[in-house]
Amino acid sequence: MSQVNMRDMLKAGVHFGHQTRYWNPKMGKFIFGARNKIHIINLEKTLPMFNEALTFVERLAAGKNKILFVGTKRSAGKIVREEAARCGMPYVDHRWLGGMLTNYKTIRQSIKRLRDLETQSQDGTFDKLTKKEALMRSRDLEKLERSLGGIKDMGGLPDALFVIDVDHERIAITEANKLGIPVIGVVDTNSSPEGVDYVIPGNDDAIRAVQLYLNSMAEAVIRGKQGAATSADEFVEEAPAESAEG
């Protein structure tokens, strides 16, 4: 089972919230106190909630479900991309396009356009075009890759969202809520936990904290997938023996 511990969280600075004047009262029960006008998050509360979220993700991955990693602010984007790719999950790291979930039909058409352009760039089609046309298509491809590259292999709506900084990604959460897609989110002291099914109270800015969340989630996905593969192997091994008896 995927687990995170108190020492890892302290080292990563998960307990440092935002300035006290920016606090959201809905996060009051997760705040331990204040130090130098900065709210300190109670990691005794975070620990079981973080581990519960990891267990949920591991279970989803074991069932071949898709978890969409979302983190579009500068401090998160690169790590979101790397960790999601490492565990084979879709991601949005650049900008959330309105309707990415609620208007998935249209998004799917844009993904098809992206795939067509990818093929054209590799099969020599671009070489046969005028310089201007080739340049326009290259720019199109670049733009589509940046905004949709992380979800081009998603193949349909995700089964859950994992979000870094719920305030920054509020549109994504609202869309997921409308469609009944569960949301796992890192919620800092200045944010609202509303609309988040699995709240992880913690610092959503520090690179080391963001790295810890994403690394732990990716590990949970990998563990879930490995568990599913192991049980599938066992099932295959047992199946012939049973049919031989029959």
Curated annotation (Swiss-Prot):
- A Pfam entry, by short name: Ribosomal_S2
Is Transmembrane helix there in the keyword field? no
Please tell me one Gene Ontology term that the record gives under cellular component: cytosolic small ribosomal subunit
Entry keyword annotation includes rRNA-binding? no
Provide the GO MF annotations for this entry: structural constituent of ribosome
Task: Give the record's keywords alphabetically.
Answer: Ribonucleoprotein, Ribosomal protein
InterPro entries the UniProt entry points to = Ribosomal_uS2 (IPR001865), Ribosomal_uS2_bac/mit/plastid (IPR005706), Ribosomal_uS2_CS (IPR018130), Ribosomal_uS2_flav_dom_sf (IPR023591)
Set out the biological process GO terms recorded for this chain's protein: translation
| Family (UniProt) | Belongs to the universal ribosomal protein uS2 family.
Q: What is this protein called?
A: Small ribosomal subunit protein uS2
Record organism = Pseudomonas aeruginosa (strain ATCC 15692 / DSM 22644 / CIP 104116 / JCM 14847 / LMG 12228 / 1C / PRS 101 / PAO1)
